[in-house]
Amino acid sequence: MKHTEVAIIGAGVTGLAAAGRLSPRNYRIFEKSRGPGGRLASKRIDAVRADIGAQFFTVRDSRFQATVDSAIAAGFVTPWQPKMGTFQDHQPIASPDQQARFVGHPYMNSLGRFLSQEIEIQTESRVQMIEPSGDRFRLILTSGESCTADCVLVTAPVDQMVAMLQYFDVQQLGSRFAMDPTWTTVLSLEEPLRGSDGESLDALFGGDHPLFDFIAVENSKPGRQSDLLVVHATPEWSQQHLERDSAEISELIRQAVSATFQVITQAKLSHRWRYARPTDPKFT
């Protein structure tokens, strides 16, 4: 049975940042999907790709700023200066701000690729259970593989973490660190997205709208050529429709976008993020 000092579960930004601080001999990182990035996700649609997870990120820490500066210099990240809007009385309006925003280049998962350049990741490896093994921990994968570790860092959403840690008293974490869902729908868009005053917009926060949480025009981001629109639904709407078929979600959101912006769209796909973000943002 293989052994490592530190086992890291999840190759999203948190897992990659932790791995970057460790000697390569001291850790193994397990990622259930085919590549790094976590919710910095993009998906191929026809001949192009669209960001279906986080639409941008901001910087609030000088250490992270240094990382972002390096990623920009290497071509993996670029600033994004969209014409911002929001919803007021359920209507789209311009709402410019001075917030510095960044996106992966050419897609959001490029930041994950940058952070993982010198990190070996065991992809398509889902950890099913973590159990005590003397003064160590034993990790059991769905593939049947197992290994031991002196320390385990779990970066998965809390509900998935609790399921892995059935041998430990962590059940209370499920309610303390609850996560909200988000339905994401990608639509075709062959004309500008405009606010109620006729001004073209690149992205909108949901404001007081009951369905829309965030909307982004893909080709407003540097490096994107696709005529696609990405819509995140609100946590409340997503929870209400959580178990519905993705085709039904696509049609509901397509109708809402078409009615709100008076544009003709075609639904391309919908993706359910069951654990999109913390219910209580004080833990972010």
Model-derived segments and their meaning:
Residues H3-I29:
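N-terminal Rossmann-like FAD-binding beta1-loop-alpha1 element of flavoenzymes
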Residues G20-I45:
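Glycine-rich FAD pyrophosphate-binding loop
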Residues G37, S146-S200, V263:
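Central helical "cap/lid" subdomain
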Residues F56-S62, P92-F114, E243-L252:
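Short beta-strand to alpha-helix junction loop
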Residues T123-R138:
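A conserved short coil-to-beta-strand element within the FAD-binding core of flavoproteins
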Residues E251, S258-T284:
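Flavin (FAD/FMN) cofactor-binding core of flavoprotein oxidoreductases
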